[in-house]
Amino acid sequence: MAALQQASRTVPIVFVTTIDPVGGGLVESLARPGGNATGFSTREFSMFGKSLELLKEIAPRMSRVAVIRDPAVAGGSGGFAAIQTVAPSFGVELTPIGVRTADEIERSIVAFARSGNGGVIVVGPTSSVQPHRNLIIALATQHRLPAIYTNTIWSKAGGLISYGPDNLDQYRRAAGYVDRILRGEKPADLPIQQPTKFELVINLKTAKAMGVTVPEALLARADKVIE
C-alpha cells in the first residue's frame, strides 16, 4: 500500500484488509481519509475479547493464555490490549509471545506448554505473523494447546478454531466503493469502513487429533465446520 501511494498520489486506491490505515500513514483519519486512498480496515480489536470467550468455551479449564503477536505493529499491540481488558473476567493469566524469529516462537510455545491448562490466541493477521502460520499451528497441535486464530486460512491449514472478519464480505463491500469512485466520488471523502460480518470456523479434524471435545452449542454457532 505505501509503495502504491508513493508511486501515485492521484490514482484512486481502495484497500480491503488493512489493519491500521491511520497508524500506517495511508489516510489522515477514518472519517475523512484525505488523500487518494480509502477502503476497509480489519481493525476491530474488540473481536479479540470474543476470541478469548470462544477459547474459554472450548477449553473451560484453561487458566493461562499465550498471546502470539507482533508488538511493533498496531494490530499486535491493540489486539493484546483488548485481551488484557477482558482477561480478568475469564480468570486467565496472559503470556505475550513475540514473533521475531521461528526459534523464538518455538522456544516460547514449548516453555509455555510445560505448565498445563494453557491456550493460545494469535493476534493478527500481520505480515510478521503470517510466515510462521504452519509452525504455530503445528506446535499448538503437538502440545495440545487449544488455539484460536484470526481468519479462515488458519483453520483450513489445521488450526483448531478461527474467528475474525469475513474477508470475502470485505471484498464485496469494496466493489461498492470502486463503483462510487468510478462515478465521480473522491476517495478522500469516503470514510474507512470497519468489518460488519465475522466468521467462526471450527476444525473438528484437529479437535479430534488433540482430544478436544467441542461443545454442541459452539458447533451450532459455527459458520463453517471442517471435518
Positions of the model-derived regions?
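Short hydrophobic alpha-helices and adjacent helix-cap/hinge residues
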Residues: 1-227
